[in-house]
Design a protein with these regions (language model features):
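Sequence/structural signature of beta-propeller domains
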Residues: 1-259
Length: 259
């Protein structure tokens, strides 16, 4: 973008595809994106503070530095959809598998040091439910659990995978290891004894007991201060219609508890 008030061309969505956001203690933001994939560091106004941090030896077809004779090794839109943090360190996670992966369920988790601005070289392997499962988001809880949101690319009655898993020992997990995960919540089978939405949205898909978050791009999982969890939808407006067929999905957010 260039206009009479700009000295240089402004960065836009044609340059980067921001997907995951982490706010640092100083109020700045770290952003995971998918074109590079890169990690970006911006201030509270969105001004880029450092040159984009490239991931070593991985490039998507949309990477601007990809040479004419160079082969990409990560599919488009399979970069850093998810990124967790424990404060100093970021944990960007590939949404899909790397092209050279022998087991295409593996989703690589890496560690990035915000103080040095470098990847530490530590990685962990997380096994998704199947080759095509997508990592929608990740979150590190205060007690050291890594929450991983897995989803498929379907909506409504066709949706089969919208689940939150937890890695209970991530804080102590050895680098280079394959992580052990446990199911925390099936978002297609949420108990709804309070009948939330059953009167106001009686014709909507998945509104009942159990409640189903059977929407396409479920891409948020966080734990709230009171212990509940929040998940949310990227509605890809106006393309998705998981709740009412033929009607663009709203941006839905729901909170739930785990007993």
């Amino acid at each position: 973008i260039v206009n009479n008030d700009t000295e240089d061309r402004l960065l836009t969505g044609a340059d980067f595809d921001p997907e995951s956001f982490v706010q640092a203690a100083d109020g700045t933001f770290w952003v995971g994106e998918e074109f590079g994939p890169y990690i970006l560091h911006v201030d509270k106004d969105g001004t880029l503070l450092d040159a984009p941090y490239a991931y070593p030896d991985v490039k998507s077809p949309s990477n601007p530095t990809l040479g004419a004779e160079e082969e990409p090794n990560l599919r488009n839109s399979k970069g850093f959809e998810a990124m967790a943090t424990d404060g100093r360190y970021l944990y960007p996670i590939f949404e899909g598998y790397l092209d050279e992966a022998t087991d295409k369920r593996v989703r690589v988790i890496s560690q990035f040091d915000t103080e040095t601005g470098k990847y530490t070289g530590k990685t962990w392997d997380y096994l998704a439910e199947d080759d095509d499962a997508l990592i929608g988001d990740a979150f590190l809880t205060k007690d050291g659990r890594l929450l991983m949101l897995e989803r498929d690319d379907f909506r409504g009655s066709e949706a089969q995978l919208k689940k939150v898993f937890e890695v209970k020992d991530f804080a102590d997990a050895k680098a280079g290891s394959t992580l052990q995960k446990d199911l925390m919540a099936n978002l297609l089978n949420i108990a709804n004894p309070g009948k939330i939405g059953m009167v106001s949205d009686a014709r909507a898909y998945g509104v009942g007991d159990p409640f189903q978050f059977a929407l396409l791009s479920v891409e948020t999982i966080i734990q709230l201060e009171d212990g509940r969890y929040l998940t949310a939808l990227d509605n890809n407006f106006p393309g998705d219609d998981g709740r009412y067929r033929g009607k663009p999905d709203d941006t839905e957010m729901i909170t739930f508890s785990v007993k």
